[in-house]
């Protein structure tokens, strides 16, 4: 653990409270502000490892909670997990089989950063596009979504794409985000319903 993490008060608080990362507080802030999770909702969390959002989700709903990630997610009581690529039809079908009706799709994932701003931005937008595609193919009409993104040249295009699929779309900066970060969340409510088509790749 680097000195930056060791000195991070929010990180230390998360560890003391039993969360796997500081990201748990970001979901708590989103829920407090937008009430995207209802007490009986079934939730699918994309890019869920190490599982801090799953820990919070389990406390917010009596419904099913499932995390999807390329890497194994350490077990959490009452939470199902799938190891695989969220863009594949096999994983999407597995999610449907396990969860049934999907009311909420969440994605706090971000790509491994290379240090090259344009490249990292493109990969982050691509991940957001994949999450939106997943939601469009699996979510029940009227469902809600929240996903992490990063401000930059292509962010507005992703935001406009999300607006095609949800009646209400907002952006949100959490207090738990590190100072100076371009991280931003897209919060989308009341899924319109679609055939699952998301237009192309954002250029």
From Swiss-Prot:
Organism: Methanosphaerula palustris (strain ATCC BAA-1556 / DSM 19958 / E1-9c)
Organism lineage: Archaea, Methanobacteriati, Methanobacteriota, Stenosarchaea group, Methanomicrobia
Reactions the enzyme catalyzes: uridine(2552) in 23S rRNA + S-adenosyl-L-methionine = 2'-O-methyluridine(2552) in 23S rRNA + S-adenosyl-L-homocysteine + H(+)
The protein, known as: Ribosomal RNA large subunit methyltransferase E
Keyword set, alphabetical order: Cytoplasm, Methyltransferase, rRNA processing, S-adenosyl-L-methionine, Transferase
The keyword rRNA processing is annotated on this UniProt entry: yes
Known function: Specifically methylates the uridine in position 2552 of 23S rRNA at the 2'-O position of the ribose in the fully assembled 50S ribosomal subunit.
GO cellular component, one term: cytoplasm
Enzyme Commission no: 2.1.1.166
Active site: 148 (proton acceptor)
An example Gene Ontology molecular-function term: rRNA (uridine-2'-O-)-methyltransferase activity
Subcellular location: Cytoplasm
Binding-site list for S-adenosyl-L-methionine: 51, 53, 69, 85, 108
InterPro entries registered for this protein in UniProt: RNA_methyltr_RlmE (IPR050082), RNA_MeTrfase_FtsJ_dom (IPR002877), rRNA-MeTfrase_E (IPR015507), SAM-dependent_MTases_sf (IPR029063)
């Amino acid at each position: 653990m680097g000195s930056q993490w060791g000195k991070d008060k929010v990180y230390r608080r998360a560890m003391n409270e039993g969360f796997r990362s500081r990201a748990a507080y970001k979901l708590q802030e989103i829920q407090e502000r937008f009430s995207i999770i209802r007490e009986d909702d079934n939730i699918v969390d994309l890019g869920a490892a190490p599982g801090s959002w799953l820990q919070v989700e389990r406390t917010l709903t009596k419904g099913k909670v499932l995390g999807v990630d390329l890497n194994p997610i350490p077990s959490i009581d009452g939470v199902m997990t799938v190891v695989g690529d969220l863009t594949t039809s096999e994983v999407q079908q597995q999610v449907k089989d396990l969860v049934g009706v999907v009311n909420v799709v969440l994605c706090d994932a971000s790509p491994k950063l290379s240090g090259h701003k344009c490249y990292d931005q493109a990969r982050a937008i691509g991940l957001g596009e994949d999450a939106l595609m997943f939601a469009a193919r699996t979510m029940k009409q009227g469902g809600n979504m929240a996903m992490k993104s990063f401000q930059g040249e292509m962010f507005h295009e992703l935001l406009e794409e999300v607006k095609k699929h949800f009646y209400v779309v907002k952006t949100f900066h959490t207090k738990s985000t590190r100072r100076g970060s371009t991280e931003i969340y897209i919060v989308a409510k009341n899924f319109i319903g679609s055939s699952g088509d998301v237009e192309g790749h954002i250029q």
